[in-house]
């Protein structure tokens, strides 16, 4: 199938097969599509509505192009979400990565610089002193030796440069926004994945299962957050080890936590968020701590280190208050200096 044939099919509101989408995405990532073609296809897919097979095929093509790592650990967690919820909150999933690592989880945090917010995971980590120029073998050592590593998306997904201009020109969410959490270069098979689109929660969990993930929670707050919201109930699609997907809702109260106001988790620029992340890992009590405890608890449930959210909160609190989570951040910073 050619790009023109694919575009004609999608414009006619016909779905691409998994194999067709893999081929077309492969052509785009190889630089064989013009920005106009990339933008037209992404727009047509969005207007039609991307199917499970189309997202799966696109993710498989992107995984095939990635610079991969192979951590020694069997259980590896990613907390990467789609971003793009427009809420401009603090980097909750980034903080969760260090808390989970402090609790004993091996974490391969996939992330990028900000797209729609003021500060993405790469921005806050760079402000903290984590190098974005780490060689891949150094990142692999971070994961194996320290239990946490940061996989800077542009370093591992260089082929995305071929679609970058079209994505900037489009200015809206497209299939590309869905792919980051589905294409962890370390092959993490356990995930806490927040999505900006509540309609995609169950679909995304099914795609993860077909991609080989073992367990995952895909979450979307009823208030629109692409996290487990500390401010409201949250929709969850849980991928279980048998491949089944179960949906339910959770609330802060389920974890023994109080609801916090949205302003408690508002984000700032990279320097401000870096200061707040340090304070959080130093044990500061705040609404932000509540948000991180709630999401870290879910991460611990996903990997099997916590029986339920309340148990997860207790273990996340211990990881922070013992200094273990802070030590994980310090190790990542110091590792980039060696």
UniProtKB/Swiss-Prot annotation:
Names of the cofactor(s): Mg(2+)
An annotated GO cellular component: cytosol
Protein name: Anthranilate phosphoribosyltransferase
Pfam families xrefs: Glycos_trans_3N, Glycos_transf_3
Residues that hold 5-phospho-alpha-D-ribose 1-diphosphate according to the record: 81, 84-85, 89, 91-94, 109-117, 121
Comment on bound cofactor: Binds 2 magnesium ions per monomer.
Reactions mediated catalytically: N-(5-phospho-beta-D-ribosyl)anthranilate + diphosphate = 5-phospho-alpha-D-ribose 1-diphosphate + anthranilate
Record family assignment: Belongs to the anthranilate phosphoribosyltransferase family.
NCBIfam families in UniProt: trpD
GO biological process: L-tryptophan biosynthetic process
Pathway(s) where this gene product acts: Amino-acid biosynthesis; L-tryptophan biosynthesis; L-tryptophan from chorismate: step 2/5
Subunit organization: Homodimer.
């Amino acid at each position: 199938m050619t790009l023109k044939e694919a575009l004609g099919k999608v414009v006619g509101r016909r779905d691409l097969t998994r194999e067709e989408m893999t081929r077309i995405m492969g052509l785009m990532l190889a630089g064989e599509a013009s920005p106009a073609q990339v933008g037209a296809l992404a727009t047509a897919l969005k207007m039609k509505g991307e199917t499970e097979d189309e997202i799966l095929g696109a993710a498989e093509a992107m995984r095939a192009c990635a610079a991969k790592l192979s951590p020694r650990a069997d259980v590896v967690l990613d907390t990467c979400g789609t971003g793009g919820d427009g809420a401009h909150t603090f980097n909750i999933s980034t903080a969760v990565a260090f808390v989970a690592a402090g609790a004993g989880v091996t974490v391969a945090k996939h992330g990028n610089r900000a797209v729609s917010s003021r500060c993405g995971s790469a921005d806050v980590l760079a402000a903290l002193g984590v190098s974005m120029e780490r060689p891949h073998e150094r990142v692999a050592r971070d994961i194996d030796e320290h239990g946490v590593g940061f996989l800077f998306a542009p370093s591992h997904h260089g082929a995305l440069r071929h679609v970058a201009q079209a994505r900037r020109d489009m200015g809206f969410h497209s299939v590309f926004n869905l792919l980051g959490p589905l294409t962890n270069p370390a092959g993490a098979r356990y995930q806490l994945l927040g999505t900006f689109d509540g309609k995609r929660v169950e679909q995304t969990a099914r795609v993860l299962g077909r991609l080989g993930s073992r367990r995952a929670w895909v979450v979307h707050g009823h208030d629109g957050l692409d996290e487990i919201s500390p401010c409201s109930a949250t929709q969850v699609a849980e991928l279980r080890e048998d491949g089944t997907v179960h949906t339910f809702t959770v609330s802060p109260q389920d974890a023994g936590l109080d609801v916090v106001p949205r302003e408690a988790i508002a984000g700032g620029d990279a320097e401000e968020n870096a200061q707040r992340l340090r304070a959080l890992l130093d044990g500061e009590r705040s609404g932000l701590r509540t948000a991180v405890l709630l999401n870290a608890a879910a991460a611990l449930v996903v990997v099997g280190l916590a029986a339920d959210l309340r148990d997860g909160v207790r273990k996340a609190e211990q990881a922070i208050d013992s200094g273990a989570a802070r030590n994980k951040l310090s190790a990542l910073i110091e590792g980039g200096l060696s």
